[in-house]
């Protein structure tokens, strides 16, 4: 009984802070527009060709799409906003070009970020 009382008192005293923390990471309702942009980014990523000498141009499309999605998730206060901002920063770095190996690693990193958002958003 004392344990239950202690838990209730703790929850009452920390009330607002706990609720705000939970709300920050609680999944938002499904947004088909946001998911559509994520699908489009995945399609663009599949078309990036690291064998081309100017593969940085392929990343410019990714950069524009991820910038749009980053702003959208930020304004919506979606829990995936930080991940999508990271994807945008990654595409900015990749659009500057580099070696073929750098491009291939960049594709893997971008795919992981896209997959993380997909897993978080699917089923909502």
PLM regions: where:
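Positively charged n-region of N-terminal signal peptides that target proteins for export
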Residues: 1-4
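Intrinsically disordered, glycine/charged-rich N-terminal periplasmic/extracytoplasmic linker segments
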Residues: 51-124
């Amino acid at each position: 009984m004392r344990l239950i009382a202690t838990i209730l008192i703790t929850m009452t005293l920390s009330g607002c802070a706990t609720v705000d923390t939970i709300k920050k990471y609680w999944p938002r309702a499904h947004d088909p527009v946001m998911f559509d942009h994520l699908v489009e980014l995945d399609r663009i990523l599949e078309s990036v060709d690291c064998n081309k000498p100017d593969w940085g141009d392929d990343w410019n499309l990714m950069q524009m799409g991820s910038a749009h999605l980053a702003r959208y998730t930020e304004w919506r206060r979606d829990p995936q906003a930080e991940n999508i901002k990271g994807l945008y920063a990654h595409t900015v770095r990749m659009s500057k070009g580099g070696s073929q190996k750098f491009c291939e690693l960049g594709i893997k990193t971008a795919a992981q970020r896209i997959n993380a958002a997909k897993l978080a958003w699917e089923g909502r």
